[in-house]
């Protein structure tokens, strides 16, 4: 339920995916607006592409970017979620946040 102050906020809906949406949303969160983001889940690049193929899941990379852009979590945690492994192992190129979101999809089944 909205309180009186929240009723005065303009409602902004952002449709998209990719880096552009996360930058736009990061900027919008500093304004008194009610933000809704509709993010595509069809990306197939790097970590997301590997995880989609391996686990047959929606693309989580753009969702991860939007979550960190809109969140109020501390910078060290944001850096950890956005961190990409640079190794010669199978983790190479994976973002920690993508692995976490994929695990949540696997745990919840949705």
Regions found by a protein language model. Give the residues of each.
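N-terminal phosphate-binding or glycine-rich loops at protein starts, especially the Walker A/P-loop
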Residues: 7-55, 105
